[in-house]
Amino acid sequence: MNYFNVGKIVNTQGLQGEMRVLSVTDFAEERFKKGAELALFDEKDQFVQTVTIASHRKQKNFDIIKFKDMYHINTIEKYKGYSLKVAEEDLNDLDDGEFYYHEIIGLEVYEGDSLVGTIKEILQPGANDVWVVKRKGKRDLLLPYIPPVVLNVDIPNKRVDVEILEGLDDED
């Protein structure tokens, strides 16, 4: 069975079994809703167990979650650094122009026929996602996921066509 990252447990929160999670999903409200089941993977990416979400709330840049039947810091402290993943069968169908992070990360970015680099990360600073493109011999390029910049996303061919607008690339 395939699993996809939705978050990483970065710390505990208080004494009642809550954990701070750094989310890597656009669907945090759905993934971390009460009753949702996620797979817990250790730092070596080995499956540990399936967990059920007992509660979820947002706090600053973190999602604060609690697992069912784990209500004390001593029970959950060992999970710091572990990843939360969703099973492939639990992924929802997306609308046209929407993609899961695992589909985007690793795609090659082209401007015309020139290879710009490879998408290595997706940031969520505000209204639009920002794709971090790793380039050879240059600093990473930050590309906003907006229509004037991202012209075409071709998942089967692992290719993204872009137009780098003036001001986006400070090395040119």
From Swiss-Prot:
State the compartments where it is located.
Cytoplasm
* Keywords, sorted A to Z: Chaperone, Cytoplasm, Ribosome biogenesis, rRNA processing
Tell me if tRNA processing is a UniProt keyword of this record.
no
Q: Which InterPro entries match?
A: PRC-brl_dom (IPR027275), PRC_barrel-like_sf (IPR011033), RimM (IPR011961), RimM_N (IPR002676), RimM_N_sf (IPR036976), Transl_B-barrel_sf (IPR009000)
> A Pfam family name for this chain?
PRC
Q: Name a single GO cellular component.
A: cytoplasm
Q: Does the keyword Chaperone apply?
A: yes
Which residues does the UniProt record annotate as the domain PRC barrel? 96-168
The record's annotation in Gene3D superfamilies points to: PRC-barrel domain, RimM
Q: Which GO terms describe its biological process?
A: ribosomal small subunit biogenesis; rRNA processing
Entry's NCBIfam families?
16S_RimM (TIGR02273)
Query: Quaternary structure per UniProt?
Result: Binds ribosomal protein uS19.
The written remark on domains in the entry is: The PRC barrel domain binds ribosomal protein uS19.
Q: Which family does it belong to?
A: Belongs to the RimM family.
Name of this protein:
Ribosome maturation factor RimM
State the species of origin: Streptococcus pneumoniae serotype 2 (strain D39 / NCTC 7466)
